[in-house]
């Protein structure tokens, strides 16, 4: 063996040993461990660089910051509701819905709110027209949290409204994700700051150039106006959400809420805001921000949050519980379908038990590896009787699930491992037959713009594409 061969073998050994030590020094799920080993072993040096920014777990100090907020008596209210549900079977006629609500009360202290008025929004034109009107009518405060807040025509138009309201004395706070809004420079916010408003980047860049926590993204989209009107769902702020991007028409689902669920959105915003800003700018859970609200509708719901700061993958647990409680049908819309074993098995059990399971995903990719992994998982569910629909009328970005037309969820969480484990997400879980049926009707209408992806469809794909699907599946725990 010559010297060069010895050096190469030595470097391979050192790289492999370093990969094993690096990955196993932090507890993580087995699938993610193997995926990171694959990256570190087969991409020497580059793999370690990628791991440094994307693979390290969130620090315990940061977890403490996110967990330690005083949440305006929410814990006590959740405990009261748990006790009430234990002795009262009249609120939930369906035992499975009661069990779902208890799951969130136990794991997330997510209180059940009643008497909400909910509007379902599926186009950017409707969403942003209504949002602008609500912002202009704000009297006391505007609290906004988005993954993406772009410096483009729509972003600048909304910013002008925020500046105007700040000049009028309305409290304006904007929280945006540093990675999602990476193309929006600090100077974009200058006039808002001069008017008295504030903007902050969640998990911002160190020294303005390096983001050491870029793998942990605040993917939530929250708007709260005067503690009375709230928005949550899939739309970010940018021209592409009006159909002006390269992906064409944008199909998403968002909720406009009036009622007590808005106070849950407010509490979530405060927790995220206070964990981001210095103590000087932290907000106190004052009655001003949590007004007493009249009953405006008939919808009951829970606002559920999840993230790497939690011990439980709460939204995923809710998805699994809903799937297992289905008796007739499950309709899922998601741009990215990369389920872990628990979700995959739940869907297989449902389909093989006679439940009609339909999954709708986009027909075009916006992330190559993610889309190929989505194709892999979709194809493998066909054998279990699951129907797969590819949305062709633009890009499908909605994140919804409807079960039996009686329960549903809308929010920011995709059906993928990133949303389950790494992102900070928020979803509304809705206990209302009318709203659930509306979402089901929307699904049916969307099918008119879909291609049914059956076995024949996938058989036509090239071997190269199938190879990319299998390779992407190996990386799925870290995509």
Task: Mark where each language-model region is.
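Short alpha-helical functional segments enriched in proximate histidine and acidic residues
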Residues: 333
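Histidine/acidic-residue-rich catalytic or RNA/ligand-binding cores of hydrolases
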Residues: 342-344, 371-373, 403
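Active-site donor-binding acidic/aromatic loop of nucleotide-activated sugar
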Residues: 388-392
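Helical hairpin unit composed of two closely spaced alpha helices linked by a short loop
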Residues: 326, 336-358, 362, 367
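N-terminal localization/anchoring segments of enzymes in phospholipid and broader phosphate metabolism
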Residues: 1-317, 321, 325, 349, ...
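Catalytic-core elements of nucleic-acid end-processing and repair enzymes
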Residues: 399
């Amino acid at each position: 063996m010559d010297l060069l061969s010895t050096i190469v073998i030595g470097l391979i050994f050192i790289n492999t040993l370093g990969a094993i030590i690096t990955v196993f020094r932090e507890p993580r799920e087995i699938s993610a461990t193997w995926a990171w080993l694959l990256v570190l072993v087969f991409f020497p040096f580059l793999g370690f660089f990628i791991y440094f920014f994307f693979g390290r777990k969130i620090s315990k100090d940061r977890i403490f910051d996110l967990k330690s907020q005083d949440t305006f008596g929410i814990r006590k209210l959740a405990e009261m509701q748990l006790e009430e549900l234990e002795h009262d079977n009249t609120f939930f006629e369906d035992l499975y819905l009661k069990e779902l609500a208890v799951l969130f009360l136990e794991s997330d202290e997510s209180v059940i709110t009643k008497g909400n008025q909910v509007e379902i929004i599926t186009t950017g034109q409707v969403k942003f027209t209504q949002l602008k009107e609500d912002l202009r009518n704000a009297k006391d405060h505007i609290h906004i949290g988005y993954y993406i807040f772009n410096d483009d025509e729509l972003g600048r138009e909304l910013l002008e409204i925020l500046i105007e309201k700040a000049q009028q004395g309305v409290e304006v706070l904007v929280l945006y994700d540093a990675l999602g809004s990476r193309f929006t420079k600090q100077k974009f916010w200058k006039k808002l700051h001069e008017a008295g408003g504030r903007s902050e980047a969640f998990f911002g860049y160190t020294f303005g150039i390096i983001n050491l926590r870029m793998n942990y993204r605040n993917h939530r989209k929250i708007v709260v106006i005067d503690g009375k009107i709230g928005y949550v769902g899939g739309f970010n702020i940018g021209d592409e959400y009006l159909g002006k991007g390269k992906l064409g028409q944008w199909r998403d689902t968002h909720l406009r809420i009036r009622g007590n669920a808005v106070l849950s959105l407010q509490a979530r915003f405060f927790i995220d805001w206070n964990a981001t800003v210095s103590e000087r700018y932290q907000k106190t859970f004052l009655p001003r921000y949590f007004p007493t609200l009249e009953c405006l509708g008939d919808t009951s719901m829970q606002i559920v949050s999840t993230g790497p700061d939690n011990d439980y993958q709460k939204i995923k647990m809710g998805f699994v519980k809903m799937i297992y409680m289905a008796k007739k049908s499950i309709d899922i819309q998601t741009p990215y379908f990369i389920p872990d074993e628990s979700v995959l098995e739940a869907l297989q059990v449902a389909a093989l038990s006679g439940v009609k399971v339909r999954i709708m995903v986009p027909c075009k990719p916006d992330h190559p590896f993610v889309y190929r992994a989505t194709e892999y998982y979709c194809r493998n569910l066909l054998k279990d009787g699951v129907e797969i629909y590819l949305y062709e009328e633009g890009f499908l970005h909605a994140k919804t699930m409807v079960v039996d037309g009686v329960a549903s969820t809308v929010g920011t969480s995709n059906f993928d491992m990133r949303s389950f484990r790494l992102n900070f997400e928020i979803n509304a879980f809705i206990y209302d037959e009318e709203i659930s049926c509306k979402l089901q009707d929307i699904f049916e209408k969307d099918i008119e713009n879909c291609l049914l992806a059956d076995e024949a469809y996938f058989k036509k794909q090239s071997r190269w594409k199938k190879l990319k699907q299998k390779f992407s599946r190996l990386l799925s725990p870290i995509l």
